[in-house]
Amino acid sequence: LQKVEPRLAESVREQPELRALLKPDGGFLWRRVAGEQRLSPHAYGVALDLSARRAPYWRWSRLRPHPMQQSYPAAIVAAFEAEGFIWGGKWHEYDLMHFEYRPELICKARILRGLEKMNAAGLGTGGTERGMEKLP
């Protein structure tokens, strides 16, 4: 979070209206995922919620997808993703207030995107050489 804060501060300087979406509403809290038996990422201290009253959650809304999934400020999402967080607004069962520290998922997504670009450009091996196959 220490690395995310300067990115957010710069975004707020450029777009002061973002400040209203940056109020922490949930961080480290021992609890289960709603409707499930497994522990929430909040229980491990790797997730936080921002401005819960302003951010739709799939269990509270009948809209699927929710229009705010497209209109949520990209600067906020980019600031968190640049430092290894994923945003719950990209999920089918969306949680727009939720950011979760999962650098391994960000890394994997970047690798897969790179492989897709290589294959699209005809640079993939097309076989199993070095374990690399053309992606479908």
Residue ranges: model-predicted function:
Residues 1-91:
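Cell-envelope/glycan interface and biosynthesis
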Residues 82, 95-136:
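Low-complexity, Gly/Ser/Thr/Pro-rich intrinsically disordered linker/tail segments
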